[in-house]
Amino acid sequence: MNAYAGLLSDEETKHNLQACKKGQYSSSNNQGISKSVLDRYCVCYVNKIDQNLTQKDIKYFKENGTYPERYNQVVFESSKQCYLKEIAK
């Protein structure tokens, strides 16, 4: 597995990876895409999210139960970059 920035615990990373895979496997948009490709997408996606999280984001999440607004852009960019890298190639 790729190296992570380390802000998310191993348990959080594992949970995020499982959630990504579950969502990708069940999406009607992904019919015909192999699980191995979707797995690579999810590893890329979770890794990119973790690389872009800051200590401030984690603190905000712990205090508010949600991530700050900028997190939506992190999610969008991570998804787009990993889609282009792993699925659309």
Where are the regions a protein language model picked out?
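Boundary at the C-terminal end of the N-terminal hydrophobic targeting segment
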Residues: A3-A5
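Short N-proximal segments of mature Sec-exported proteins
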Residues: D10-T54
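Compact alpha-helical subdomains of small soluble proteins
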Residues: S36-K89
